[in-house]
Amino acid sequence: MADTRAVAAATSLVLTLGVVCCAAPGLAQQPDSAVQRRDTSVSAEVLKQLSIEQLMNLEVTSVSKRAERLSQTASAIQVITREDIRRSGASSLPEALRLAGNLQVAQVDSRQWAISARGFNSTTANKLLVLIDGRTVYTPLFSGVFWEVQEVPLVDIDRIEVISGPGATLWGANAVNGVINVITKNAKDTQGFLLSGGGGTELRGFGTARYGGALGSSVRYRIYGRGFARDETDSSSGQGATDDWHFWQGGFRVDWDQSTTSRFALQGDLYDGRIAQPNADDVAVSGGNVMAKWSRTISETSHLTAHLYYDRTHRDIPDTSGEHLDIFDDTYDVELQHQARLGARHDVVWGLGYRLINDHVGNTPALAFLPAHVARQWFTGFVQDEIALVRERLHVSLGTKVEHNDYTGVEIQPSGRVNWTVSPSTTLWAAVSRAVRTPSRIDREFFAPGQPPHLLAGGPNFHSEEELAYELGYRHQHGDLALSVATFYSRYHGLRSLERVNPPAPFPLVIGNGQDGESFGAELTAEYWVTQRWRLSAGYTELRNHIWPNPGSTDASRGSAESHTPDRQFFLHSSVDLPARVRLDARFRAIDDIANQQVPGYAELNARLTWQPTSKLDLSVVGQSLLHRRHAEFGTPPTRREIERGVYGVVEWRF
C-alpha cells in the first residue's frame, strides 16, 4: 500500500482536525447567545440520531427492486446520501463514487475514469451495471460506461445505492460484480431558484442554474443547465497532456401526483462536449435521453410500475490522419414490474422487459466494427419471492432472471439469499448467485486494422462470461457506532482472452473465452459519532484476483487486461460542524499499488471548508489531492497521466 508513514501522518491529520475543532476550549460549545446554544444543541442531537438510524433503517430499492430497510438487505450495499455528496466537495459523479468504500475508483486523465467493484477494473470495465433513475447508462461497444458524459447535477441527487457483488437476478446481464443506482430528487424537493458556480486551478470554471416550480396543486417541475471547463492533466514527464475539455448539459423533470395512488414522471437531458487530444482534432461527444415512469398502488399489498425511455449517444473521434471514428447508439427500453404480498409470508416481485439498441459506426482504416450497423434485441423476465420463515427474524429470497439476447440466446441467472436478524442491532446474511456478462460488439465485431490482414479480430464464437458468487455478511449497531462486514468468493469461467491464431507467432489475435479466474476478499465499513458535531466514517477493502488460461488456450494477455486493481484500499472521512455556520470535511484515502501497470501506491487527502452566512447562501473552498503536487492513479507508462493538486471555490445561492 502507500507508504505507511504517509498513511499514518494523513490519518493523524484528519483526526487532529476533528479533535481541535471539537475540543478546543469554547470553540464548539460557545454559541453567540443562549438562544443559539439551545437551538444548535437540539439541531445537532436530532442530526446525530437521524444519521445513525438512517444507516440501519434507510430505505433502499436496488437489492430487491422494492423499498426495504438497509438492515434487512442480504447484500453488500452502501448508500451515499445527499448530505454525503454535498459535504464531499465532489464536482462530478465519479468523484462522488469515491465515497463508496466497496468500489475501486481511479481517475485516468481529465475526463476518463476506471470504476469497478471487486476487481476487473479498466476504462472499459464491463462487469458493473450503472443506472440513473432506472435508465441503464450502457454502451454496446464494450458493455461499459462512458463516465465523462454521466454528468448528473449533484445537487439533484437524492442518494446513490452501491451494491458490490452480483445483482443479475433482478437487473440482468452485466450486473456481475456490482450495481450503481443513482436516484435523483422528486421535483417537489427542488422548488425555487438555485445558482451555483465557481472555479479554480484544475476545475477552471463551472456553473449550474436550476429552477423548480408548480403547475396547479399536483404537478411539480424543474429545469436546469450546467457547464464546466477542466484543465489538462500532466504526462509522466510533467508536460501538459493536451486533454482539457469543455461540457454543457441541460434537462428537466416533471412529477405529477395524479391521485393518492397513482404517479407519473417525465424527465430528460441533452449534452454536448469537446475533448482535446494531442496531434488531432477535438473529440466531440453529444447525446440525450427522455424517460417516462408511471406507478400505481393497486392495494395495500399490490404495486405496479412501468418505465419507457429513449437514449441517444454520439461520439466523433478524429485520429492523427484526419479519419473519424463516428459512433451513434440509439437505445429503446420498456419494463413493467409488479410487487404483491401473497399471504402473511410471501412478498413477490416480477417483471418483463424489452430493449432494442441500434448501433452505427463510421469506421476508419485503423479500426472497424463489422458490420458497421447492427440492431440487437433483449427480452427479459424476472421473479423473486422473499419468504418470511420467521417474521421479523429470518427471511429467504429466491429468484431468477431469464434473458434472451441476439448473441448467445437464453441466459438464466438465479440467486438465493438469507437474512437473519439476530437482534434488533445485529444482522447476518448470506447469498449464492450466478451472473453472466454477455458479449459486446468489441468481443465479436471489432477489427484492427479495419481492412485485412487483421492483427486483432473479434471472436465470432465468443460466449458469455460466467460467475458463481458466494457472499457472507454482518451488520451491527452499538450506540453511536455502526459496523458492516462483507466477505466474498467468486469463480469465473470463460473470461475474455486474446488467442494466438498461429502460435508462437504473436499475430493475428482473436478474442476468445480462454481464461478462468477467481476473486475473494472482504469489505469493512464503520461509522462513529464522536460527538454531536463530529462524525467519522472509515473503510477497508482486501481483494485478490487470480486469472489463469484454460487448457489449450493460446492467450497472449496473461490476464493483464482483467486485473488492473489494487489489492487493498483504506479510507477515513471526517465531518465537523463548527460554530458560526462553518463546516469542515476531510476525506483521506490510501490505495495500494497496481503491480501490472507499475502504478505505485499512493495516499491523498481532499478537504472542504464551508461557511453559510445565511440559510440560503453557501461559500466553500475545496482542496483536492492535497498531499502531492501530482500523482498517478491508473494506466501504464509512458502514456500514463498524472492527476494534479487542485483548489477551487464555490458559491451556491438558493432563493
Model-derived regions: residue spans:
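Short, acidic, small-residue-rich periplasmic hinge/interaction motif at the N-terminus
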Residues: Q30-R86, T297
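Extracytoplasmic beta-strand/coil segments of soluble accessory domains associated
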Residues: T61-Q78, P94-T136
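Short acidic/polar hinge/loop motifs at secondary-structure boundaries
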Residues: T136-S164
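Periplasmic-side early beta-strands and strand-to-turn transitions of outer-membrane beta-barrels
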Residues: A168-T169, N181, D189-T190, S196-G198, ...
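Conserved C-terminal beta-signal and adjacent last beta-strands/turns
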Residues: G212-A214, D257, A430, L468, ...
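Face-selective signature of the C-terminal outer-membrane beta-barrel domain
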Residues: D257-Y271, A284-V410, N419-S423, H476, ...
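Outer-membrane beta-barrel signature, preferentially recognizing the C-terminal barrel domain
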Residues: A280-N289, K293-T297, I327, T427, ...
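Gram-negative outer-membrane beta-barrel transporters
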Residues: A388-V390, L394-H395, F488-R491, G512-D593
